[in-house]
Structure formats: structure tokens, C-alpha cells
Amino acid sequence: MPVGRRERNKEEKRERILAAASELFAVRGVDDVTTQQIADAADIGTGTLFLYAKSKGELLLMVQNKHYEDALTEGSAAAAQEVDVLDAIDAIIRPIVLCNREHIGNGRTYLREVAFGDASEPNHTRSLEIVVASEQLLAHTIERTSALDSARSASLARAVSSLLFRSLAAPEQISGTSTEIVASIRRDVANLLGRPADD
């Protein structure tokens, strides 16, 4: 079989797996879905499924990475329109918070996989690349919209990233709304900058 066709078939199977896992996770939550159900929905064998992701956690990373990439793209475009540092940071983190909170159980499991998953797996590697990209976007945006130099902007970006992770992972935030979480992060960032959150 020609390489081109083989690669097309691989990509087509990957897209079927992605679509099946995405739908099942969205409807039932990652904890209530089996790999067999995903394989059946994608019309492939479980052996084939494990060639693309070695665990259910990896499958969740595969699905959620795409959503987080889209959220980061949306946040980047929105932040480019802002001139105030707090508004620009809000513009970046809001789509990420909404993405994570679309299904709270899946969002929390995703964060756990990002933090503690197998770093040698491609989907985990991609999730870490998204974290780095989000921090770089934050740093660039902070430097553009504030009086901070590049080093301090990078430090604040890491702090915002940590605040975001903690806010999404904290047990007390399970019942919080996306709007409340974004507002809480805004207040914390404003405190770091020494200015009112609603300035």
C-alpha cells in the first residue's frame, strides 16, 4: 500500500477516534466511558485504539487538547484587541476557563493527566506544549499592555498560569461558575499589580 494512502487511513481512524471519544466524554463523562465503547463507536478494534492512545487518560488528552488549542486561539485574538493588562489577561483566560468547565469532571481529570500523566506519550507532550504556549501568550500580552519588562512579564505570566491551574483544580471551585473563577483570578492578578480589579 502506498505511504500516502496508509497515512490517510491513519488520520481517518484518528479522526474517528477523536469524534467518538469527544462525543462519549461530553455526554457521559470520562469516568463513565470505557475504551471498548470508544472503539465500538469509532468502528475499530481496541487493539487499534491503543495504537493511538495507550489509556483512557491519553484519549481524554487527545480530545481536550484540541479544545484547549481552540480556546487559546480565541483568547489570543480577543487579547489583541485589548489595551489594558487586566482586560487582556481576562480575554486570554476566559475561553480556557469555559473550555475546562464545559464538563467539570472531564476538566479536572484533564488537569490531573497534564500534571501527572506519562510525559513520554505524544498527547501528554502536546498538552504541555499548550501550557507553554499559553504562558508565552500571557507574557507577550502583559509586556504589550503594561509597563513591565520582559522578565517581569514572564514572571507574572507564570503566576497567572499557576492561579488558573489552581482555580480550576481547587475542590472549593467545583460549584463556582466560570464568571466567578475569571473574576477571582482577575482580583488576584490586580493585587499582584497593586491596582484595583475593576480599574
Which residues make up each language-model segment?
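Basic, helix-initiating cap at the start of DNA-binding domains
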Residues: M1-R28, D32-A41, E58-L61
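Alpha-helical DNA-contacting segments of helix-turn-helix folds
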Residues: A53, L60-H67
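Hydrophobic alpha-helical connector segments
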Residues: M62, S76-E102, L156-V160
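Amphipathic alpha-helical packing segments from all-alpha helical-bundle domains
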Residues: E69-L72, E102, A119-A147, A154-R158, ...
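Amphipathic alpha-helical segments used for helix-helix packing
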Residues: N100-E121, A169-E172
